[in-house]
């Protein structure tokens, strides 16, 4: 079992009757579906958890009568018989609250459905399965808070935090509300599972241990310090709701509607777009950034489409599911060269080979080595030991955001305590993780928050290209030359020799005449290509020989043909792009070709033009004057997993007057990876034996600098949820995708587009935190009844962390039906339509748990729980008892109309029956942000209301009988209904409408109405005026097409233009 039921079950490990006192047992008296009556239950409490039968089915006491207790059982009761044992646990039905909640789908009693499926290999939940609600195997990175040993701590105090995922970057660890005491031990920063002790507290001489999670009874509201008045809107992104019937963060809302009216669409729209919690990180790149595609090709980021596949760092494809676009301050990321030119030496170039441009909120994938060092220092005459470590922590950004980053943490104490304490700290830090580094992400704009030592140590990575295509082999297959199976290897090696020291107009290159093994290799390989190798001595340098490779077919017997005729090597040089516009070039396809082919080509290049040394580890150096060879070689070496750096040597004239062009030295190292390349060399000074053991091609680090650029357009790609959200740019830098998500509720999250809101002057992505408890179809009704309490308890837990949470109950009618069934089995007196008389009280006890509150404990934090309940009355009848009871409690009513839904008018909100009681509460918010908002809202409601009355008149006497003023009211009302109240949820421009766009649209529609009424009042004829200002009406209607992604400032400018044009056009038309 899990969660709610696991909390009791873990106390009772498959027990036998002998394990407990006889007084703890009762016996089954009767069974009626999920309702079981047990006798001999004196001493049990209401809502106590019990174990029913030999299978330990979990149930809850819901009525006590003498020694008999009525129990609702949360599992199938088939097979229970009278006389079976019933064991009392002494605990209420509770849920587990801690890290891991947001990555699991639960059923109504907090059973993790995915974990149960994996354990049972069944799509059904077997009876008695024992799976904990929160995964006990995952290790969480715990960072202690400000509390230390000796401090007093009370319920709700935050004593640490955990990095759960990129969505919940700081999951606060709270002391359970009913606990308190003095801290006697707290765990240092490190990785812990949920079962490991984190905190030890002593109160009244009794010690208690606490872990990363705690349990809480679902039927008991979590206590708060103070309930506050909610005064901030719950922005849904739906114009009709945000403008006319707003809800607040911490409010209660009812959405009744018949089947097919769009309740679930509105609920999911809330899940996706509302402002309950905005913790999505979006990272994107500048136009022209080259991305490595899954097939090894290179594509500009702006040309990538949804469905394309990019390459991951493991060589496997990653599918693109979204393409975020926008405009933001950009940052240039540039590799720090190991061969930095002096600033005064302007003649010397420093090749910056790893670089890209990203937006401010792009997440850089970085690593920081774990570091611990010990110092001794004297403070006020006292000598201290100081242990300084790098640890994951938090820092507040200037705009108030909490940023998760690596920090330098210092601990010091008098030297009189001896060095043992310092050694102990150093040792515990080293043992805390088996990784040598922290792998984490940080937004580009936040890099300046890092301390100098951490910033200096932090680096990014580039990955080897593990993907292999057969471009080279396919070329050989299609070649007119019938070569042996060794053809690709032979050709790759000779191409390497030619790139290193060959002539750019023929298949000729130079070799060292003293290196007999190299000359033998050339002769052997030439033979395999059906070529002859002709050696000629060179004057300069004397030790070199020129090797001409020519075809046996067309040369000999006194005939001296062109060296390039019928020559497979020359054909490959030209055909594969090794010679471009008369200049040597290493084509990009080579970096994704077969790894053996890449290594052989590089071995040929090293044999021809390389230098190998064993000083301080194996290294190889190649020099070239061609930038195309330099860039291609760097890309090729990195694709194999080698460490590469480049040094530029400026152009010069030597003592003999010889001019030397600018040249580049490419330095390569990489241990076994490089040894494997050198094992394919033939040169006696270059060859090294292959590594004896297998080796892995790892990501390599590079240190980088960041420079802020001006604002510009950015282009992003979002990868599928089941990937690691990382892919490779064409230069093999490992980068993060846009729109990282941490939740597995696929039906809500798969379609999350990247959205932004303006917060503290910077663009922030919007993300709605969803609380979803999904009941399986074959669960007993008792579990369905409990599910609503499970959901609200989870919501309250996140509220206590200082978050704004929305709970969506879809549908509370199903919950009420479960109440009705249990009530019927208990034989209670039915009320209206068979529902129990206490339906209203039960609903109220649930809705009263919503609200904005100051959480218990320190530091001070404010959170809210908003409840949105979808109700499904039979036939759309709003007089249904569940709807009536809900309307009596909730403050906002979004009534859905089946007729509107049938006309495909979505959201199908009936404006004449819907209402919100929060409009006055929100006036303070509107006054400080959009002062005209309440007036515009009232005007819009007035127009719609007047139009409804006029429509009845029109049905009697026709539209022509109306005055021009009334005709304007009707026409503008139609415009509002079609272009303001309706929204296309499947478009980029209308899926989410920010409050600022809603406000500007209201101004535009009301201004159009006022200008028209003013013109008619001045004597204009409306039918003629409507024709002459048709373009203005079209512009007002089209204002919904303004893309919110362009930003508030730009879109507001468009509306200002529209308003000034409107005034001019009406003025012209009435003159």
Curated annotation (Swiss-Prot):
Catalytic activity from the UniProt record: ATP + H2O + 4 H(+)(in) = ADP + phosphate + 5 H(+)(out)
Post-translational modifications reported in the UniProt record: This protein undergoes a protein self splicing that involves a post-translational excision of the VDE intervening region (intein) followed by peptide ligation.
Positions with a binding annotation for ATP: 257-264
Leftover remarks: Present with 199895 molecules/cell in log phase SD medium.
Domain DOD-type homing endonuclease: 494-642
Cellular component aspect of the GO annotation: fungal-type vacuole membrane; Golgi membrane; proton-transporting V-type ATPase complex; vacuolar proton-transporting V-type ATPase complex; vacuolar proton-transporting V-type ATPase, V1 domain
Broad class of the protein's primary localization: membrane
Protein encoded by which gene: VMA1
Keywords, sorted A to Z: Acetylation, ATP-binding, Autocatalytic cleavage, DNA-binding, Endonuclease, Hydrogen ion transport, Hydrolase, Intron homing, Ion transport, Membrane, Nuclease, Nucleotide-binding, Phosphoprotein, Protein splicing, Translocase, Transport, Vacuole
Name of the featured protein: V-type proton ATPase catalytic subunit A
Organism of provenance: Saccharomyces cerevisiae (strain ATCC 204508 / S288c)
Modified residues (Phosphoserine): 858, 928
N-acetylalanine carried by residues: 2
